[in-house]
């Protein structure tokens, strides 16, 4: 059984970014709240939108920072500090260029893969990388110079469906993570591929 007390969905704020690939982490948290009949509400002291729910018998707080992506650590550190939540009790959901749409991966600790949101969170948690990451695949444009435009672009409908399916399965696997352990959650999530029969 894994103890997760805070689930964070990374995003850029504002309507113009809401449907961009970079906001995949927030899509996951929004759907998780919706599934539990909760609505994220703005809470200025945590620099973001928050909710609280009972997930697999555990008291879990949700957070979507309202800062820009590269300042996400400010919101995460504020909430973790206030509720005395340790890095290893935090799950951060984010978009992942190195994974195709329709696939998501779960891991504990590791590098930031050049993701500015993860970089800032790790820095604000005292350079402790030992938090859970839910990596939601968005695919790669194939050329490094196109990455910024790609992550800040909206996926076509076919890709959006695949990403949504992976998020849906990720929510089921989050419950497995909380009820059982990371190995079982990873085994299930890593064998899932949206669109595969």
Curated annotation (Swiss-Prot):
Main localization (coarse): cytoplasm
Molecular function GO terms recorded: peptidyl-tRNA hydrolase activity; tRNA binding
Gene3D superfamilies, A to Z: Peptidyl-tRNA hydrolase
Signal peptide location: none
GO biological process, one term: protein quality control for misfolded or incompletely synthesized proteins
Entry GO CC: cytoplasm
Top-rank taxon, per record: Bacteria
Site-annotated residues for Stabilizes the basic form of H active site to accept a proton: 95
Record: active site: 22 (proton acceptor)
Transmembrane segments: none
Binding-site residues, tRNA: 17, 68, 70, 116
Catalytic activity: an N-acyl-L-alpha-aminoacyl-tRNA + H2O = an N-acyl-L-amino acid + a tRNA + H(+)
Keywords: Cytoplasm, Hydrolase, RNA-binding, tRNA-binding
Enzyme Commission number(s): 3.1.1.29
A Pfam family: Pept_tRNA_hydro
Subcellular location: Cytoplasm
InterPro entries: Pept_tRNA_hydro (IPR001328), Pept_tRNA_hydro_CS (IPR018171), Pept_tRNA_hydro_sf (IPR036416)
Residues the UniProt record annotates as site (Discriminates between blocked and unblocked aminoacyl-tRNA): 12
NCBIfam families xref list: pth
Assembly with partners or alone: Monomer.
HAMAP family named among the record's database cross-references: Pept_tRNA_hydro_bact (MF_00083)
Family affiliation: Belongs to the PTH family.
Function: Hydrolyzes ribosome-free peptidyl-tRNAs (with 1 or more amino acids incorporated), which drop off the ribosome during protein synthesis, or as a result of ribosome stalling.
Protein name: Peptidyl-tRNA hydrolase
Species classification: Bacteria, Pseudomonadati, Pseudomonadota, Gammaproteobacteria, Enterobacterales
């Amino acid at each position: 059984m894994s103890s997760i007390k805070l689930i964070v969905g990374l995003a850029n704020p504002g309507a113009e970014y809401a449907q961009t690939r970079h906001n995949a982490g927030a899509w996951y948290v929004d759907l998780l709240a919706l599934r539990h009949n909760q609505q994220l509400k703005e809470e200025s002291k945590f620099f973001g939108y928050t909710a609280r729910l009972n997930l697999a018998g555990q008291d879990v707080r949700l957070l979507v920072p309202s800062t820009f992506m590269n300042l996400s650590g400010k919101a995460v550190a504020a909430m973790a500090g206030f509720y005395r939540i340790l890095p290893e009790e935090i799950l951060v959901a984010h978009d992942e260029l190195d994974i195709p749409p329709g696939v998501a991966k779960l891991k504990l600790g590791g590098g930031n893969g050049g993701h500015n949101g993860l970089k800032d969170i790790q820095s604000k948690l005292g350079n402790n990388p030992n938090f859970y990451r839910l990596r939601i695949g968005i695919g790669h444009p194939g050329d490094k110079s196109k990455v910024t435009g790609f992550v800040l672009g909206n996926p076509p409908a076919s890709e959006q469906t695949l990403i949504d399916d992976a998020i849906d399965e990720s929510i089921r696997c989050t419950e497995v993570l909380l009820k059982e352990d990371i190995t079982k959650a990873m085994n299930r999530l890593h064998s899932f591929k949206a669109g595969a029969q």
